[in-house]
Amino acid sequence: MNFLWKGRRFLIAGILPTFEGAADEIVDKENKTYKAFLASKPPEETGLERLKQMFTIDEFGSISSELNSVYQAGFLGFLIGAIYGGVTQSRVAYMNFMENNQATAFKSHFDAKKKLQDQFTVNFAKGGFKWGWRVGLFTTSYFGIITCMSVYRGKSSIYEYLAAGSITGSLYKVSLGLRGMAAGGIIGGFLGGVAGVTSLLLMKASGTSMEEVRYWQYKWRLDRDENIQQAFKKLTEDENPELFKAHDEKTSEHVSLDTIK
């Protein structure tokens, strides 16, 4: 048992990136970026202040790392839902087209393919939109509730996942009445609890915490902004073509028309 506890990092080596050093050395406390991250947080802030800070845009026009994670989860959910809905709906459209047009006389082979392609594309778009916004709204609500509760409490636990799963499941089945909402809440709470236990176990096994995850998000944002600034700087330096640069080097001496008579 002791061997498994000491080798807990190897249990998720294929899932999470590895770090050198002990678990408490993953984030260097003397790092300038970490100090700047701590300096941006008030020393004694309430839950409402943390929640307000989450929805505040900084001076550079960037959203908070917590809100950015909710946005990424919602977009990923929309993308997965759109792909799933598009594939399933287009497959149904293909089968219906083949069954309903077995005796149809088309002008040519290309005309049949064109109509099949049109119906395939339209149904793919319909299915993608139908499932995309639903899954996107579900994942955005789920991760949004988890993040808001975690930010308000200042820590992460299983309760956020249970509450988020129950609330989201109930709202998803609101069209079925109270019984549907109750069933959706129970199923959502169960699935949310499973997801919460899995996430917390992964963080514990890797020796990380939610604060460290937010720190790395903060650091990656700084690195991204710095790379963008360097790219713009290089772009402005390369605006002059090589021909103009060569001309400027050859005519670096001051040329005047005063000597011409």
From Swiss-Prot:
It is a multi-pass membrane protein. Pfam families: Tim17. Associates with complex I assembly intermediates during its biogenesis in a NdufAF3 and NdufAF4 dependent manner. It comes from Drosophila melanogaster. Keywords: Membrane, Transmembrane, Transmembrane helix. GO terms for cellular component: membrane; mitochondrion. It is found in: Membrane. The chain crosses the membrane at residues 67-87, 131-151, 183-203. This is Complex I assembly factor TIMMDC1, mitochondrial. Its main location: membrane. Belongs to the Tim17/Tim22/Tim23 family. Chaperone protein involved in the assembly of the mitochondrial NADH:ubiquinone oxidoreductase complex (complex I). Essential for viability. One of its GO terms (biological process) is mitochondrial respiratory chain complex I assembly.
